[in-house]
Amino acid sequence: YYLNRNRYEQALKYAENVLKEYDVLVDYNSEMNKDVFEQGVYLPSTFDWDVQTYTKRIAWKESLYMRYLTSGNAVMTYFPSQSLLDAYEDKEHDLRYRYHFVEDAAEVMFWSSYSYPAYVFFSMSHVLSGPTTAEMYLIKAECQARLGEYSRAMETVNALRAKRMVPGDWVELKAGNVKEAVTKILQERRREMPFSQRWFDMRRLNNNEETYDDVEIVTRKFYKINATTIFDKEEPITYTLEKNSRKYALPISENEIEISDGVIKQNV
């Protein structure tokens, strides 16, 4: 809440309070591995085909509140944009890329005519989205940087990276000023929490006082669909999300508007 309101002192305070109580991180060097699927695809050890089995979700020790994205469809899959794939600049040493991105998933698992990776966490359709200790480290680091303590911010974010990267000189990020520190921390945030927090980050970063952290215009192309058909013989439709677009505002629940006796107005 406080981070989204750009109230960095308060966000820092509560992130630090959480970490004082519980600061455990999963070490991807020793606590993650890959299992081989029967079709030759390597899946992370967190994965479970049975979406009704919650053992591995409950066992994820970074979770502060167990919550995850889900489509309600066991075969719904998260396919990354090229921009997200490019965000993992060190694919050789970044263990998040090694374990959570399944190469050739589209071709091997969904019999697609082309090869493309998929992002996988607990299942094809379940991605961690609840608050975690990793997110608290990132909130703490970003707030420290924005408040001028960029050297300490780098120490904070590097504590997380040490659990996510193969050991080596590439683990530690360095910054010489606030802008550089914030930029690197936001890049790390995107690598750590794809799909779950990106929408909210794009919205807040385009609506704060700084301009150096703005997210540029987002453009996507999708085929027209209905309940039964994908019209893949037609030209795809281009969708554009401008900076500061009102499309970032989600509709307010009609129930909330009604019980407020008109005080709350609908987003338009």
Regions found by a protein language model. Give the residues of each.
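Acidic/polar-rich alpha-helix caps and helix-coil junctions
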Residues: 1-64, 68-74, 83, 88-268
